[in-house]
Amino acid sequence: MKEGRILIFLAGMCAAMIATAQEERDVATHQHAWYMAFGNHRITEALGVHTEYQFRRTGLGEDWQQSLMRVGIDWHRDNNHFATMGYGWIRSYAYGEQPIAERFDEHRIWQQFITQSNTGNFNWTHRYRLEQRFMDRPTGASWQHRARYFVQVSWTLPNQSNWFLSAYEEAFIGLRDLDNLTNNLLQQNRLSAAINYRWDNGTSVQVGGLQQLLIKGNGQAERNQTLLIGLRHNLDFRD
């Protein structure tokens, strides 16, 4: 099936890029926990609102890693294709073996397009995202630009219509900063698997794990194991 071949190709490509990216890098390993809430709320047939907050902590919650908030406006072509433009606020904190010098805020403009499809008992989601990132560091502000590709597959358990498994792969590609091309083309790679429960009203919860490779421009890298606990609740204001 087409989506399966895409996933295999992407995994192979990312594996090769990861192996190259980790050569001669100082790699640190951490354990994190991300607590997340998402919503896509339909206002009309064409328009909706995206809401998101992620409470990212070190360990199981001991200290801050990152606080992330996103809001956006959705435009729906139909129930399986929609685009979003929005704003994100992210505060990053010093943590772990390779801490940043001081906490800083990021203001992010982002655009994305999502497609959804079914292949037998498998449900596929593809997300294509662009980000324009204003990094307000104490040492000076800068702009960075990034592209992201996300593919997720989910499978409903037999005779258990409310339970389903999901897995995703996401690659983060650095485009350029204000003056120069980035020297770490692959900035992040994420691989995740989770078990999910969905109520009849569409609200769902997720518990899973994430393997994150974070590749920095200074020659360092992080390999992080992360617990994921998420809630998705979509509101529908259409008549």
Stretches found by the model and what they are:
Residues 51-55, 85-89, 126-132, 167-171, ...:
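Transmembrane beta-barrel strands of outer-membrane/channel proteins
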Residues 37, 70-71, 111-113, 149-153, ...:
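Membrane-embedded beta-strands of outer-membrane beta-barrel proteins
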Residues 23-77, 82:
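Start-of-domain marker
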Residues 16-19:
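N-terminal signal peptide c-region/cleavage motif recognized by signal peptidases
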Residues 31-33, 65-67, 105-109, 141-147, ...:
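Residues that define the transmembrane beta-barrel architecture of outer-membrane proteins
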